[in-house]
């Protein structure tokens, strides 16, 4: 994941990574609002991602396989919000021509710019990979048998997936220096880092849409009630086996031939029967999640493609596309925790009164969760 604007047609080696500090004085008044937006995203994203990491590390009920991938993404987003965004906000407020640090720190030919680009690339790449891991985890949780899910997401396998996401991101970041434009050199006709960024975003979008739309189809045709963002499965997982044991089906009387007719499956009790509104709400939640991803990433895809083929892209379009993508780093915790009752309880226990409003707003639409004792297994929320 690389910044396409770093390889744009601008040859200003001292400019900001997001072209917030161009040499043109006409942009001076427009850099301030963008810097203020980065400042707000930095503060909000740092607090939100830090809170999720703290809650998961402090409460054992939150230490599940799915939350491990969420925490991995929050750690990557925290590096973007706490380390990279403040630098962009400060650089955007500096006068034109003084976007880089003073002194000889950057005498090595854009080393500070490469450092910021590498930090951004590492954080965003791990974050996007974590979104894919969360989507794949949820897709397999619904579409595969519990035993298969447990085998795939053993603790060792989960740790390997997390380590692989960082190793892959680090490998991609190490490819940045050879492709960095040389000071005073003519810009190439094809910018491969920008094309690589566009290809990575398109691949991630395809995987997310496949997983989440597959979940929507499964929820629509299934009798199980699923809260997709919370992932409380009340069918197919052993919780329904416990319900079936509590409501056994009586065998039919033997027929004339002496053979007993096979027992017909007993319907689930009314408390476990899904309601159409709840299934529709789960589907809308997934579609909303997909829309957020598309809105945050697709503008950057087109900007990266245009920059990759040396097509002129207005500065405002570049800044807006990167702001949307970076906003995903700040909103990442809310995407996965806003309807999770365990997270709300944890927030209320740490900050009394803070989560009451969110709990009241979600009370009418929340899907009741089954405890681990009711599930009888750790398939839906395998602990680390």
Curated annotation (Swiss-Prot):
GO biological process per UniProt: adenylate cyclase-modulating G protein-coupled receptor signaling pathway; cellular response to light stimulus; G protein-coupled receptor signaling pathway; locomotory behavior; motor learning; neuromuscular process controlling balance; neuronal action potential; phototransduction
Glycosylation sites noted in the Swiss-Prot or TrEMBL record: 3
Annotated localization: Cell membrane; Cell projection, Cilium membrane; Cytoplasm; Nucleus
Annotated transmembrane regions: 36-56, 74-94, 117-136, 159-179, 196-216, 286-306, 311-331
Main localization, broad class: membrane
Its membrane topology: Multi-pass membrane protein
Keywords for the protein's UniProt record, in alphabetical order: Cell membrane, Cell projection, Cytoplasm, G-protein coupled receptor, Glycoprotein, Membrane, Nucleus, Receptor, Transducer, Transmembrane, Transmembrane helix
Cytoplasmic face residues: 57-73, 137-158, 217-285, 332-384
One family name in Pfam for this protein: 7tm_1
Disulfide bonds: none
A Gene Ontology molecular function term of the record: cytoskeletal motor activity
One GO term describing the cellular component: nucleus
InterPro entries assigned: GPCR_opsins, GPCR_Rhodpsn, GPCR_Rhodpsn_7TM
Expressing tissues: Expressed predominantly in the striatum. Expressed also in olfactory tubercle, nucleus accumbens, amygdala, and neocortex. Spinal cord, pons, and medulla expression remains discrete. Also expressed in peripheral tissues, including adrenal cortex (16 dpc to 21 dpc) and cochlear ganglia (19 dpc to P3) and also at moderate levels in retina (18 dpc to 19 dpc) and spleen (21 dpc to P7).
Positions in the Extracellular compartment: 1-35, 95-116, 180-195, 307-310
Record's function text: Orphan G protein-coupled receptor implicated in a large repertoire of behavioral responses that engage motor activities, spatial learning, and emotional processing. May play a role in the regulation of cognitive and motor function. Couples with the heterotrimeric G protein complex of the G(i) subfamily, consisting of GNAI1, GNB1 and GNG2, thereby acting through a G(i)-mediated pathway. Plays a role in the attenuation of D1 dopamine receptor (D1R)-mediated cAMP response in ciliated cells. In non-ciliated cells, involved in the inhibition of the beta-2 adrenergic receptor (B2AR) response.
Family: Belongs to the G-protein coupled receptor 1 family.
Name recorded for this polypeptide: G protein-coupled receptor 88
Species this chain originates from: Rattus norvegicus
Gene: Gpr88
């Amino acid at each position: 994941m690389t910044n396409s604007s770093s390889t744009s047609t601008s040859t200003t080696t001292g400019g900001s990574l997001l072209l917030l500090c161009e040499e043109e004085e006409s942009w001076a008044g427009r850099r301030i609002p963008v810097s203020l937006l980065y400042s707000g995203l930095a503060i909000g994203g740092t607090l939100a991602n830090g809170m999720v990491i703290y809650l998961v590390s402090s409460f054992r009920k939150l230490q599940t396989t799915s939350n491990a991938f969420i925490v991995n993404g929050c750690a990557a987003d925290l590096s973007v919000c706490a380390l990279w965004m403040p630098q962009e906000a400060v650089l955007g407020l500096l006068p034109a021509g003084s976007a880089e640090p003073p002194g000889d720190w950057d005498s090595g030919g854009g080393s500070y710019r490469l450092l910021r680009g590498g930090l951004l690339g590492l954080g965003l790449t791990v974050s996007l990979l974590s979104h894919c891991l969360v989507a794949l985890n949820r897709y397999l949780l619904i579409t595969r048998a519990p035993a298969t899910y447990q085998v795939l997401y053993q603790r060792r396998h989960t740790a390997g997936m997390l380590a692989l996401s960082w190793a892959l991101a680090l490998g991609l970041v190490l490819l940045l220096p050879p492709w960095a434009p040389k000071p005073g050199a003519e810009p190439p006709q094809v910018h491969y880092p920008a094309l690589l960024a566009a290809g990575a975003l398109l691949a991630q979008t395809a995987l997310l849409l496949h997983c989440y739309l597959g979940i929507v189809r499964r929820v629509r045709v299934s009798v199980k009630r699923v809260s997709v963002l919370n992932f409380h499965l009340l069918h197919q997982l052993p919780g329904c086996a416990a319900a079936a044991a509590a409501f056994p089906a009586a065998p039919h009387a033997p027929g004339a031939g002496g053979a007993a007719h096979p027992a017909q499956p007993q319907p689930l009790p009314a408390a476990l029967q899904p309601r159409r509104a709840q299934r529709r709400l789960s589907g809308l939640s997934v579609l909303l999640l997909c829309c957020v991803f598309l809105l945050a990433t697709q503008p950057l895809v087109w900007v990266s493609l245009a920059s990759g083929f040396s097509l002129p892209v207005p500065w405002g379009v570049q800044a807006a596309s990167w702001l949307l993508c970076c906003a995903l780093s700040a909103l990442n915790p809310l995407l996965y925790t806003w309807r999770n009752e365990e997270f709300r309880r944890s927030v209320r226990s740490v900050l009394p009164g803070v989560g009451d409003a969110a709990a009241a707003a979600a009370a009418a639409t929340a899907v009741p969760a089954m405890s681990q004792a009711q599930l009888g297994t750790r398939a839906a929320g395998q602990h680390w």
